[in-house]
């Protein structure tokens, strides 16, 4: 599934840091590896069911950054996660999936030892 990923500047900075840390050249590869690593935890509540993931302002401040190709299974898992947790409503499926990915990057920033990409 190809879609446009929307990120905030803080998430773009996290991606840049991860690219440097793991010697990865592509934004897309960082996103894919981060998502897969989050799934391997098999504990969605750890990442998504926290107060820090509920919007307090600027929820819709993310801008489309780049196109990404993700396998359908992972894309559908991200869609389901969005439905399972009490996130704000978004206008499109792409924005909903982007929200779940931003949550993963928030988690990586706060718990860098928990996920290994």
Residue positions per predicted region:
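Surface-exposed, Lys/Arg-rich phosphate-binding patches that contact polyanionic backbones
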Residues: 8-29, 33, 71-95
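Short, basic amphipathic alpha-helical segments that act as recognition/interaction helices
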Residues: 25-50, 89-117
